[in-house]
Regions:
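Charge-rich, well-structured scaffold segments of protease-associated domains
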Residues: 1-141, 150-151, 155-161, 166-170, ...
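Short, flexible/disordered intra-domain loops and linkers
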Residues: 189-197
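Soluble C-terminal extramembrane regulatory/interaction domains of multi-pass membrane proteins
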Residues: 145-146
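Active/ligand-binding-proximal structured segments within catalytic/core domains
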Residues: 43, 60, 174-187
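Basic, alpha-helical interaction scaffolds
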Residues: 201
């Protein structure tokens, strides 16, 4: 979780005091908790009805992992109905203790930030330890296992996700960089785009799937990376009459990437797009501050940008092929929504990657 504030430089002391007080000393009113629970229930219903990709990604995590990563991002209705101020206060006491908090900033000097933050965090630490007997929670564990989840829908459209483990997650810098570049290499999107080359029209899923198979509505790469693990794969949608063909097409694209190196020109284009994305994002101070915080939580320090740039530049067609082969050697995770009767069995799809 992240809390942020954006202010003019002279107002940093006041903003920091407000931010630390809101994060570390929150007050939960019963009516506020009830209103928030109602909004979350509405968000969950909206995702179910209008965001099949988001719903499938939730389902994919549920079958791909055991442990914390298998739990839904949007709380089930039965959990929301039991939500109370006391539960939220206990959660904050256990998880928002200063030893587990990273304060990151951009546009302010490090020494100045430390001098401003130290008394605020020390005060909160002493007050929280005296007012709460809760012990800090251990980092949750998750294990990748793979699996299958299918939900019937009479919408006439079948949505599909095929995913594999990106073992090592963010802490495996070469591996996470390969996943990032792979997402640009595969690219994809919807069957209609008003864009041009800058919109990824030369990516593999556009040129090899969407441009060749008019019945495919959507085909795009996805990735969800965490500290020590992650998911990488392809999301696609088509008319239900083409559901079985959709599995064939997506499977073949992933198998080909794992079996032979991509042309050097394609990889260089994907690497250039990844480099551009990384460097352009870091032009924003808000992104820089978030990046510092995330890296300190993940690596214990902030790595220089050059380390990621060098890792991207070092990728070769052979190393990209090896990275995809490593991922597709893990158990398949598959999620589908639509005419599931027309889809091949999980064991048949998984066997294609053996």
């Amino acid at each position: 979780m992240a809390y942020a504030v954006d202010v003019a430089r002279p107002l940093v002391p006041e903003a920091l005091e407000l931010l630390s007080d809101a994060v570390l000393n929150p007050k939960f009113e019963a009516w506020e908790v009830e209103a928030a629970a109602q909004r979350l229930a509405a968000d969950a219903a909206a995702m179910k009805e209008g965001n099949p990709q988001g719903g499938l990604l939730e389902a994919l995590h549920e079958v791909a992992y055991t442990g914390a990563l298998a739990r839904p991002l949007l709380a089930p209705t039965e959990v929301l109905s039991r939500l109370a101020p006391e539960a939220l206060s206990r959660f904050v006491a256990e998880n928002f203790a200063p030893p587990r908090v990273v304060l990151a900033a951009a546009g302010v000097g490090h020494s100045e930030l430390v001098n401003l933050a130290a008394p605020l965090l020390e005060s909160s630490s002493s007050s929280s330890s005296s007012s709460s007997s809760a012990s800090p929670v251990r980092a949750p564990e998750s294990k990748y296992v793979g699996g299958d989840c299918r939900q019937f829908s009479a919408s006439g459209v079948t949505h599909l996700m095929l995913g594999f483990e990106a073992a090592g997650g963010w802490r495996d810098v070469p591996g996470s960089v390969a996943v990032t570049v792979l997402q640009f290499l595969l690219g994809g999107g919807g069957s209609f785009s008003a864009g041009g080359p800058g919109k990824g029209m030369h990516s593999r899923l556009y040129s090899r799937v969407l441009a060749k198979h008019g019945w495919v509505r959507t085909c795009a790469a996805f990735s969800s990376l965490y500290n020590d693990t992650g998911l990488v794969g392809v999301y696609a949608a088509a008319d239900s009459s083409n559901a079985a063909q959709l599995v064939d097409v997506v499977s073949e694209e992933l198998r080909e990437l794992a079996s032979k190196p991509v042309p050097a020109a394609e990889l260089e284009r994907a690497k250039a797009a990844a480099l551009s994305s990384v460097l352009m994002n870091l032009e924003s101070r808000a992104v820089v501050a978030e990046d510092i915080g995330r890296q300190v939580l993940t690596y214990g320090t902030r790595k220089p940008v050059s380390e990621f740039v060098d890792a991207i530049k070092a990728l070769t067609p052979a190393s990209m092929c090896a990275a995809v082969k490593k991922a597709t050697a893990t158990p398949l995770s598959m999620a589908a929504l639509g005419d599931i009767a027309a889809l091949p069995r999980y064991s048949e799809v998984a066997a294609r990657f053996k």
